[in-house]
A protein has these predicted regions:
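Catalytic cores of peptidoglycan-degrading enzymes
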Residues: 1-89
Length: 89
C-alpha cells in the first residue's frame, strides 16, 4: 500500500522534481522565508508553480535518492536555515 504525503501548510510549490540526493522531492514556499521540503518520494503529484492547500496530497512515500528504505524526509527551513519542525506544528 502506497502512503500519501501531504503539504504541511498552504503555499506555492517551488520545486517538484528529481535530485540525486533527495530523489523525487517537493519544496513548498509558505511566505516570509518559511519553506518545507519533502524528500525521497516514489512519485510526486504536484508541479512547480502550483498553489497547494494545507493537507493537500503532494506525493507518495518512497526510497529514491540517497535512502536505505521507504520514508519521508521532512524539513522546515526559515530563511534558508533548517529549524525545528515542532515550532511550526
Amino acid at each position: 500500500v502506497m502512503k500519501s504525503t501531504y503539504a504541511a501548510a498552504a503555499g506555492t510549490v517551488i520545486t517538484a522534481g528529481w535530485s540525486n540526493s533527495a530523489g523525487n522531492w517537493v519544496v513548498i514556499s509558505h511566505g516570509n522565508g518559511l519553506v518545507t521540503k519533502y524528500m525521497h518520494h516514489s512519485s510526486i503529484c504536484v508541479s512547480a508553480g502550483q498553489r497547494v492547500a494545507k493537507g493537500q496530497q503532494i506525493g507518495y512515500v518512497g526510497s529514491t535518492g540517497y535512502s536505505t528504505g521507504a520514508h519521508l524526509h521532512f524539513q522546515v527551513e526559515l530563511n534558508g536555515t533548517p529549524v525545528n519542525p515542532n515550532n511550526y506544528m
